[in-house]
C-alpha cells in the first residue's frame, strides 16, 4: 500500500498520541510496617521516623530534618509516652544535655480502642546533665493527674494509602500547670502520631514505609 504524505503524517501523530490514551494503573499502596520503620511528614515540614523495638515499644523521632533539633519519644500502647528527649533548637546547644523525661503510669494503661478511656496518676522524672567537671545531673520530679479518651473512628488517606484511624486526647494537670495532647492513632499499624500539643496543631500530611 502506498501512503500519501498526509496519510503518513496522520499515522505518525496517532502513534505518538497512543501512549497518552493508555493510562497506567494507579500505583499500588505501599502499606508501611512499623517493625521496618515508618516515615511521616507534619504540617510544619518536619519529617519523622517511627519504628517498633524488640520489646514492643515504639520509638518516634518527630524531627529528622532540622539540624540539631531533637524530639525523640518512646511510646507504649500507641499513645502513652514513656520517655522523651527534646531539644528545640536547630543549632547545637552547649552547657547541658537535652532534657530527658521519663514517665510511669498508674493504674495499668489501656489499649486505644473506640470509646476507651483511662484516668490515673503519672509520675515524671526529668534529668539534665550539666557539662561540668563532675557531669552533674539535675533531677526534677513531678506528679500529674491525667485522663485519656479515644474517639472518632474514621478512614484517612495519606500518600495514596487508606487507613482506619482514631482520635485520642489527653489532659495532664499538676503543679506545673496543664498539658494537652491529641493524636491520630492507626490501629492496623499500632502507631499513634501527635497532631496537637497545648492548642497548637501540627497534623500529619504524608506517611509511608521507611
Task: For each feature predicted by the language model, list its residue ranges.
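Generic hydrophobic alpha-helical segments
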Residues: 15-16, 167
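C-terminal segment of N-terminal export signals and the immediately downstream linker at the start
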Residues: 20-29
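Acidic, serine/threonine-rich low-complexity disordered tracts
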Residues: 28-95, 99-102, 125-210
Amino acid at each position: 500500500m502506498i501512503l500519501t504524505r498526509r496519510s503518513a503524517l496522520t499515522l505518525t501523530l496517532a502513534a505518538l498520541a497512543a501512549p497518552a490514551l493508555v493510562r497506567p494503573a494507579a500505583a499500588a499502596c505501599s502499606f508501611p510496617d512499623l517493625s521496618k520503620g515508618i516515615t511521616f511528614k507534619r504540617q510544619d515540614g518536619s519529617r519523622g521516623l517511627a519504628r517498633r523495638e524488640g520489646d514492643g515499644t515504639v520509638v518516634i523521632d518527630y524531627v529528622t530534618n532540622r539540624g540539631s533539633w531533637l524530639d525523640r519519644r518512646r511510646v507504649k500502647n500507641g499513645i502513652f509516652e514513656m520517655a522523651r528527649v527534646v531539644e528545640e533548637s536547630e543549632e547545637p546547644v552547649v552547657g547541658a544535655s537535652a532534657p530527658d523525661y521519663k514517665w510511669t503510669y498508674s493504674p495499668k494503661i489501656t489499649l486505644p480502642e473506640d470509646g476507651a478511656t483511662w484516668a490515673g496518676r503519672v509520675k515524671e522524672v526529668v534529668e539534665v546533665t550539666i557539662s561540668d567537671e563532675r557531669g552533674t545531673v539535675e533531677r526534677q520530679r513531678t506528679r500529674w493527674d491525667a485522663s485519656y479518651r479515644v474517639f472518632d473512628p474514621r478512614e484517612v488517606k495519606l500518600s495514596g494509602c487508606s487507613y482506619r484511624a482514631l482520635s485520642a486526647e489527653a489532659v495532664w494537670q499538676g503543679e506545673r500547670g496543664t498539658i494537652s495532647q491529641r493524636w491520630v492513632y492507626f490501629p492496623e499499624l499500632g502507631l499513634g502520631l501527635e497532631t496537637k500539643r497545648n492548642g497548637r496543631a501540627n497534623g500529619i500530611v504524608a506517611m509511608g514505609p521507611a
